[in-house]
Each structure stands twice: as structure tokens, then as C-alpha cells.
Amino acid sequence: MKGGFTGGDEYQKHFLPRDYLATYYSFDGSPSPEAEMLKFNLECLHKTFGPGGLQGDTLIDIGSGPTIYQVLAACDSFQDITLSDFTDRNREELEKWLKKEPGAYDWTPAVKFACELEGNSGRWEEKEEKLRAAVKRVLKCDVHLGNPLAPAVLPLADCVLTLLAMECACCSLDAYRAALCNLASLLKPGGHLVTTVTLRLPSYMVGKREFSCVALEKEEVEQAVLDAGFDIEQLLHSPQSYSVTNAANNGVCFIVARKKPGP
């Protein structure tokens, strides 16, 4: 893309949550690559956090953006969930939904789909309330800091979740590798990292504005996770991609990894 890498200042000034949600999360039943990507992530998360899956007390979601779908599956398994994002607007959008404020984004279709995966599409309202109760805080995050949640200091978590965010925050493979190490510092030994990464994505559109990414290969992501001190328990490489006019990625990688117990 033209110009330099779009860093935090550009996100703070120009990233509009409603444009982003309209582009990537209009889950209205009509078929689209974006809807299929959302389904893919919800299915992976259901398998990861559903019956017999990961559970614990605390989960930190890094780079939540203005979305809540990524913690729908986990709210039955974790009682203390932290959402986080770099930009004020995204955090405000999250708070609107959590507090049921007028004009909050309607996540009902995604919540209903998540409940269908659990075999009970009728309990979607209960699911929303369970999630609202489980989310204890919405914090600012910066994955380039040694403590990505600074100045907040939280107890080490059982799980760190980050979907479709790290590749947008990092300008290079080295920056991505360093950021993964920062995320690892938030986890207990033996805790889990759960992440979806869009592959070979140079940039993506939000409204009429283009935001840059680091274009990662599956092997680079895999090695970065290993080098950050994790053992990979699951790696799913899918050809799932967005509409080329929105985000010209080439597949995605879903990973569940366990932080090594220590030296």
C-alpha cells in the first residue's frame, strides 16, 4: 500500500468501528466470504472452548476491536474475561454493547449461530447475559509493550486469545515475534494461547481507508509461536479468505498452543 505502515496513531484517528463492523460482520444470512470467515472462527472457538475443551478462571482477549463474538464460546468456561483494544473508539463500542446502551451493535445473528453450534439456538439471550457477566473489564492494550495491558497489571491468565489482530498491529515479522513474546508474559506456565492469523495479508479496507498488515506465511506463524515458548497443540490451516476488495489474504491459520511450564 502507499505510504508507511499504519501504526497506532492512524488507528486512533481513522479506524471507524461502524465501518469495520459493516464490512466484516454483517451476518444477516446472505452468503459472503466475510460471513464464512466469521462462521469459521465461531466453529473453531466452539471446538476449543466447548465441552471437554479449554477452561479456567481468567481469559484475556488481546486486540478485541469492536467485536464480542470471539468470547462467546469461552464465557461458559471462564468466569473472568478481559477485553482490550488500542483505540478509544473500539473500547467505547465494546462498552456500549456490554451496558446495553442505545445504538449498540446488534450481535444477535452471531450469538444465535454460536448457540446453534452448542445445540441450543433458543438460549441466545441467556448467552448474551452470561457473556456480559463474565467480562469484568475493558482495557487499553498495546502488543508492543512488555506488559501489553500497561498500566494495568493483572494476575497471570489461564488463556490469552487474539483473533485477526496481531498481523494488523505489527509492521514486520520481527515485530510479530516480539509481540507474541509479550503476550506470553500474560500467561501462567501451562496456560493457553488461542489465535487466528490471516495469512499473506498486506492490507485491509475499513470504509475507504486502507490499513497495513504484515504478510505472514503459515510456517512463520508456527515458528514464532514455538519460539515464544509454546508447544502447539492444534494447528488448522484453512484456505478461508475475505472478499479480495476488502482484504486480499490467502488463507488463515488457527492455533491452540500451551505455554511451556518453565525452565
Curated annotation (Swiss-Prot):
The keyword Endoplasmic reticulum does not apply. Its main location: cytoplasm. Keywords: Cytoplasm, Detoxification, Methyltransferase, S-adenosyl-L-methionine, Transferase. One of its GO terms (biological process) is response to toxic substance. It comes from the Eukaryota. It is found in: Cytoplasm. Widely expressed. The highest levels were in thyroid, adrenal gland, adult and fetal lung. Intermediate levels in heart, placenta, skeletal muscle, testis, small intestine, pancreas, stomach, spinal cord, lymph node and trachea. Very low levels in adult and fetal kidney and liver, in adult spleen, thymus, ovary, colon and bone marrow. Not expressed in peripheral blood leukocytes and brain. SUPFAM superfamilies: S-adenosyl-L-methionine-dependent methyltransferases. GO terms for cellular component: cytosol. One of its GO terms (molecular function) is N-methyltransferase activity. InterPro entries: NNMT/PNMT/TEMT_CS (IPR025820), NNMT_TEMT_trans (IPR000940), SAM-dep_methyltransferase (IPR053384), SAM-dependent_MTases_sf (IPR029063). S-adenosyl-L-methionine binds at residues 20, 25, 63, 69, 85-87, 90, 142-143, 163. Its EC number is 2.1.1.49, 2.1.1.96. It catalyses: a tertiary amine + S-adenosyl-L-methionine = a methylated tertiary amine + S-adenosyl-L-homocysteine + H(+); a secondary amine + S-adenosyl-L-methionine = a methylated secondary amine + S-adenosyl-L-homocysteine + H(+); a primary amine + S-adenosyl-L-methionine = a methylated primary amine + S-adenosyl-L-homocysteine + H(+); dimethyl sulfide + S-adenosyl-L-methionine = trimethylsulfonium + S-adenosyl-L-homocysteine. The modification N6-succinyllysine is found at residues 13, 96. Transmembrane segments: none annotated. Pfam families: NNMT_PNMT_TEMT. Belongs to the class I-like SAM-binding methyltransferase superfamily. NNMT/PNMT/TEMT family. Monomer. Functions as a thioether S-methyltransferase and is active with a variety of thioethers and the corresponding selenium and tellurium compounds, including 3-methylthiopropionaldehyde, dimethyl selenide, dimethyl telluride, 2-methylthioethylamine, 2-methylthioethanol, methyl-n-propyl sulfide and diethyl sulfide. Plays an important role in the detoxification of selenium compounds. Catalyzes the N-methylation of tryptamine and structurally related compounds. This is Indolethylamine N-methyltransferase. It comes from Homo sapiens (Human).
